[in-house]
Amino acid sequence: MAKNIQAIRGMNDYLPGETAIWQRIEGTLKNVLGSYGYSEIRLPIVEQTPLFKRAIGEVTDVVEKEMYTFEDRNGDSLTLRPEGTAGCVRAGIEHGLLYNQEQRLWYIGPMFRHERPQKGRYRQFHQLGAEVFGLQGPDIDAELIMLTARWWRALGISEHVSLELNSIGSLEARANYRDALVAFLEQHQETLDEDCKRRMYTNPLRVLDSKNPDVQALLNDAPVLGDYLDDDSREHFAGLCKLLDAAGIAYTVNQRLVRGLDYYNRTVFEWVTNSLGSQGTVCAGGRYDGLVEQLGGRATPAVGFAMGLERLVLLVQAVNPEFIASPVVDIYLVAAGAQTQSAAMTLAERLRDEMPGVKLMTNHGGGNFKKQFARADKWGARIALVLGESEVADGTVVVKDLRSGEQTAVAQDSVAAHLRTLLG
């Protein structure tokens, strides 16, 4: 007997019951993006490896440990995308979208990182990102954060996420801070774990978000990044905080917040939650004014964020399950025998024309009334339409509310209006 082939570890199938939840959440996210005037861009899953090395940084965990990289038949090094910003910038440069233009873009799709699979974190994961090009003021940073806050309200999870902000300044300011931080860490190497000792010289800012409690305690006495900020970055960050205060968006300034990718400057932010066990990041982003030029384009200010959809789905399921309690179908059409099947299918098509968006399923495969009503219940239908020979003859259909059990015969010509009333 042949051995079953299974999905690769950390790469999951999403079955019909799960995809219905995803579609509901994704639809909400896309509607909010549209209300802010953002446009979708669709990008390749595979890119040339140098794109990510140049954008993300050679000495980041993503590039050193986590990328799925391979050579194609021409000997070119290709990589399954580990994040979306680099590909979005590459596309903007390649197609002339960024030259003296303002762009507000979003994308959605699978990303790939070779990490240890755990709840909410997989080797193939799904990400929604938004990127804005051509605007350099703190007002657009604030708008992106306001947009995400509107998502949380729409999903009913506002009370379960909190915003952390920081400014990591300019490249020059970070270089000065990096020197001070390394000098401090060198004096306390006995407290550092092996990972922090390695990062101390390759990417010292990553030591700031070490999960080691001893290292975190040590960092209480470390130099603070905010003390090294340039004047422009201070002014930018103060402007952002003022706008968020005016919008009523609560936040915490976290001086240890740095992002895991090298291209960020000035604003960085994360929305975090404690509702999934240990604290986890739901959405994160920041400003990356140098990346377009770094990848071969003209100097272009830019800011964006990305959100892992697996973790968002888990959060909505945990704290607002009513949001996703949506039936697979609204209406189930029961037909009494093969002789009425044609009339049932004709009626179903007419109702789909008259009621766009309604989820209507027609019974197929026969079965008596008991079996058909059991199928209606299985699919979560609120209403059953019953069509027998007598109803076909006199142009009516029986409408049964499956919650209350009430039923009434309605003329087929007016059944759509009757159903709209029942469905609200």
UniProtKB/Swiss-Prot annotation:
A GO-annotated cellular component: cytoplasm
Superkingdom field: Bacteria
GO molecular function: ATP binding; histidine-tRNA ligase activity
E.C. numbers: 6.1.1.21
Catalyses which reaction(s): tRNA(His) + L-histidine + ATP = L-histidyl-tRNA(His) + AMP + diphosphate + H(+)
PROSITE patterns (alphabetical): AA_TRNA_LIGASE_II (PS50862)
One GO process term, biological-process aspect: histidyl-tRNA aminoacylation
Keyword flag Ribosomal protein: no
Sorted UniProt keywords: Aminoacyl-tRNA synthetase, ATP-binding, Cytoplasm, Ligase, Nucleotide-binding, Protein biosynthesis
Compartments, as annotated in UniProt: Cytoplasm
Subunit-structure text: Homodimer.
Assigned protein family: Belongs to the class-II aminoacyl-tRNA synthetase family.
HAMAP family: His_tRNA_synth (MF_00127)
Protein's name in the database: Histidine--tRNA ligase
Biological classification of the source: Bacteria, Pseudomonadati, Pseudomonadota, Gammaproteobacteria, Enterobacterales
Gene name tied to this protein: hisS
